[in-house]
Amino acid sequence: QEQMPFRHINDAAKIAQPGDEVWVAPGVYREYVDPVHAGREDARITYRSVEPLGAVITGAERIQSWVPYKENVWVCRVANSLFGNYNPYTTMVYGDWYFAKADKHTGCVYLNNRALYEAGSVEECIKAEVYECSWVPEESTYKWYTEQDQEKDETVIYANFHGADPNEENVEINVRRECFMPSKTGVGYITVSGFVVTKAATTWAPPAAYQDGMIGPHWSKGWIIE
């Protein structure tokens, strides 16, 4: 397919067979890759970034529809249809052996690749107080908060960018639960090499439950992730 390359990695993942190599050009791939076929121990299926760390698979989308709300806080509205059957802004982090309060969502807001801190209310978002437990307290004043507009079926996100214009800066939100993971089990002998994998809205993964992650084998064997 060198003369007529696929537009999406997942297009290749649907048809790749044992022994195939999928070479991925540099760029940002905003998609979920769901490999369908397993390789074999003597004939792996390999997904390789042509340029090491040049191909980025991200679970986020850029948002440029922010409007000023109050002080340093902006607000945007996102149609829930964007998220499909998994909305990171209605899904909480919780589960077995998770002992913190279940008040944080799996989604997040990013300003120039820096994750903002989730607030418990719009007021908290506006106040932008330091979170003392943070390893970088000065960054913890960048806050976000979310709520649902049931009538319009929209996710509403407020964010405090401290004077930055979110429509000019690179501001992203999580959209996808995973970046590279088979939806079915037993898709073995896969190699994934040289990618940046980032910004998926994964759930909590206790040892006795579904092992979620930005990238993972989903109960398959013989994987190499490098």
Model-derived regions: residue spans:
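Extracellular polysaccharide-degrading/modifying enzymes targeting complex plant/algal/animal polysaccharides
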Residues: 1-226
